[in-house]
Structures are given as C-alpha cells and as structure tokens.
C-alpha cells in the first residue's frame, strides 16, 4: 500500500517575502511548488494538499473595502472571503499540478473542494478575538468601523489599527467523507484551504462565522479524516528549533512526540508561527499518525525521505 501524505503548504508556496502578490508572481511560485509535489507523486505517494491563504484573504478584504468606499458595492462577510480564497488558490494549484504531472506522463485528476470547518460556538476564542485581518486603519476610522459593523479592533504592534477575529479550534470538516472518497479513488484533492471556512452547527443546520482557523491545525484534522500516514507541514524555515533566534538555537531533527510536547509546553514555539505547526504535529502522532514533518518548502522531497526537517514519530 502506498503511503498517504497530507502536504500543508505555507504562505511562501504562493507569495515570497517582498513580493506584491501579482498573479504572475504567485503563479511562478505555485509552479515551483507543483514540481515538488509532482516529484512526490512520481515516487508513489498518495497526496492530499492543503494551504494557507493569509495574504490572499487580506487582498480580497482590501478589494471589498475599496469597492464599498469608492463604488458603494456591498462588502461580503469574512467567511465568504475565505471561500473566495479557496477557489482562487485552489484553481492555481490544481492547474499547475495537472500541467506538471502531464509533463511527466502521469494522468491523475486534481480537484479543489470548497471546505467548511466545524468549530464549537462555545469555543473561548469567540470571547477573545486575537487574529488580525484586513487593512490597517488610523484609530479614528477603526473605532468608527467597530461601532458601525460590530467589529473588535486593536492596535497592531504600533503599525496602526486592525480588525481582530476569533481563531477557534477546528473540530472537523463538513466535507470529510466526500474528500475521503475522492482520495480513496485516486484523485488528488486540495482541501481545507486557509483552514477552511469556519462554520457552527445550530438547530441541525450549519452557518458561517467570521473567524480564522489555523491552517496547520485544520490540516491535522484533514490528515486524520483521510487516514494519512504522514503529515508534512512546509514553511520557510528548515524545521522547529529550541531557543530560535538566539545563541542557544538548536534545530530539532528526529524527535519523539513526548519530547516535542514537553518543549511545546515549556513555550519554545511562538504562537502564530511555529507554535501551531508543532501542536499539529503532536496531535497527528497522538491520534495515530506514523510521522509528522516540519520542513522547508524547497526541500519537501528530501524531508519526506527523512534527510532534512524536523521528523516527529510516536
């Protein structure tokens, strides 16, 4: 049986630091990423893909902001922006990957699923929004918008004021069974983009909520749902490190899950960057996964072979 791997792509798969985020820039980055993924598929792995969407959702929100202020076009809620980003990014990845596979003589279907992620409406994150989204405003404008739209706004590291939204823990995906069936039939699925569109269940129905779900934690849920053997989280550093950015910096190569959990609880990994990646790796192994990897995007193939990155095992 071929090993099944969920690949969680970081923001650098789409937009590199210093880039503006033009279509051509992003497509070039996606093509490079597609080469890595195609090589993994060529080596016999079954692949499921998930990805981040931070800069792209930011762009969509800016477009809406400009459309509303300049032309009176009604802005759509945050969950709609998340769904739009899944279509946008999924389209680029599935096209680039299909082209790359065909160059190698591999005939495989690639599809994107607009994925909804279930969260608990009683999650404490809803009482304490922390995730900055959208454009920067001056204090006066931010507070005016907060009053008009019911937003929570906070100052963001002295750079201006921004809207903040909750970041609840993912409980699972509405489309989990559909995704699993597609994967079982040999189709390459792109799902849970940007962590998925957050939804809550009320009176037997689901409805979207304005929140942001961490894409690595949602990716871990996806890996459980498709019975993956490996969860590989790709980013712009070579793995997880203790005392990161200090003289005592120590990169973790091969680590047992209990040891990694101890480091996590000691606060070695920053919330909002490496923290969720490490937590996703811990959860995956504790929930029955064989191996979790945190590695640099450009070294995905070597990381899967165990030659680089942080390799987490039971």
From Swiss-Prot:
The keyword Transferase applies. It catalyses: hydrogencarbonate + NH4(+) + ATP = carbamoyl phosphate + ADP + H2O + H(+). It is an enzyme of class 2 (transferase). It is found in: Cytoplasm. One of its GO terms (cellular component) is cytosol. Keywords: ATP-binding, Cytoplasm, Kinase, Nucleotide-binding, Transferase. Its EC number is 2.7.2.2. SUPFAM superfamilies: Carbamate kinase-like. GO terms for biological process: arginine deiminase pathway. Signal peptide: none annotated. One of its GO terms (molecular function) is carbamate kinase activity. Pfam families: AA_kinase (PF00696). Gene3D superfamilies: Acetylglutamate kinase-like. Belongs to the carbamate kinase family. Homodimer. This is Carbamate kinase. It comes from Pyrococcus horikoshii (strain ATCC 700860 / DSM 12428 / JCM 9974 / NBRC 100139 / OT-3). The gene is cpkA.
């Amino acid at each position: 049986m071929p090993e099944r791997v969920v690949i969680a792509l970081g923001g650098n798969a789409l937009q590199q630091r210093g880039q503006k985020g033009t279509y051509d820039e992003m497509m070039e980055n996606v093509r490079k990423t597609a080469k890595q993924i195609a090589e993994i598929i060529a080596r016999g792995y079954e692949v499921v893909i998930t990805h981040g969407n931070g800069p792209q959702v930011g762009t969509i929100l800016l477009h809406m902001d400009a459309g509303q202020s300049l032309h009176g076009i009604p802005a759509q809620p945050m969950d709609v922006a998340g769904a739009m980003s899944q279509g946008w990014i999924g389209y680029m990845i599935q096209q680039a990957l299909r082209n790359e596979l065909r160059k190698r003589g591999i005939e495989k279907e690639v599809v994107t699923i607009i994925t909804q992620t279930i969260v608990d409406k009683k999650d404490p994150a809803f009482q304490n929004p922390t995730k900055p989204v959208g454009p920067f405003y001056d204090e006066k404008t931010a507070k005016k918008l907060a009053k008009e739209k019911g937003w929570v706004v906070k100052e963001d590291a002295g750079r201006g004021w921004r809207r903040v939204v909750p970041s609840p823990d993912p409980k699972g995906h509405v489309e989990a069974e559909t995704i699993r069936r597609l994967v079982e039939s040999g189709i390459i699925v792109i799902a849970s983009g940007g962590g998925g569109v957050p939804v809550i269940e009320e009176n037997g129905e689901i409805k979207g909520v304005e929140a942001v779900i961490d894409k690595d934690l949602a990716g871990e849920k996806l890996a459980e749902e498709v019975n993956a053997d490996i969860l590989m989280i790709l980013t712009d550093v070579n793995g997880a490190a203790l005392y990161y950015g200090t003289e005592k910096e120590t990169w973790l190569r091969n680590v047992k899950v209990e040891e990694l959990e101890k480091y996590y609880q000691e606060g070695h990994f920053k919330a909002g960057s490496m923290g969720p990646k490490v937590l996703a790796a811990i959860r995956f192994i504790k929930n029955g996964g064989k191996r979790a990897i945190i590695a640099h995007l450009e070294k995905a193939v070597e990381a899967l072979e165990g030659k680089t990155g942080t390799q987490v095992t039971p």
